[in-house]
Amino acid sequence: VVHRADGSGTTYNFTDYLTSVSKDWDTRVGRGAAVKWPALNSVGGKGNEGVAANVNRIRGSIGYVEYAYVKKNNMTFMQLQNKSGNYVSPDDITFAAAAVGADWFSVPGMGISIVNQQGKDTWPITTASFIVMYKDPKDKDVSKEVIKFFDWAFKNGKKLSEELDYVHLPESLQIGRAHV
């Protein structure tokens, strides 16, 4: 088993998924940006690039990395059974299905976990990146410019996000961002 040696959002998302499908994992290991891996012969890698390099180097190994590293390194991926019982592959369609199916407004600020969402086409280990800003910033002019940038990115960043192997925020969620 190859895992992140450093704390990471990728590890948090992966262990968040594992806690959602295994009571034993939840009890013994839990979720976090860094965890004590129970595998006896586990190997740590620094960053996604370190995990990808170790998985490619160690015959018969298995690990987890951000999707962009799977594509960039021509790595083999596996299908997973999602919450609806279907076996799905990781791709922009299954990631978007997980995002669209999530109840974004169930907590303030849309800060929810979207792992293991219901839906026939959902990839079960999907996460979202969030932008966190002060409600009452010290420099309001800088904050206004940052908000303008992200507004531009939401409206015009589809091509760039796809080039980086990320999924652009579905239109239905872009409308919801005004409520945050």
Located regions from the model:
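Short loop->beta-strand "edge-of-pocket" segments that line small-molecule binding or catalytic clefts
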Residues: 1-7
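Tryptophan-centered motif/residue detector
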Residues: 25-26, 37-39, 104, 123, ...
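Extracellular/periplasmic juxtamembrane helices and adjacent flexible linkers that interface
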Residues: 115-177
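Ligand-binding pocket segment of bilobal, Venus flytrap-like solute-binding proteins
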Residues: 7-102
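A generic structural signal for short, non-catalytic loop/turn and secondary-structure boundary residues
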Residues: 57, 70-73, 107, 118, ...
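Cyclophilin-type peptidyl-prolyl cis-trans isomerase
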Residues: 49, 97-121
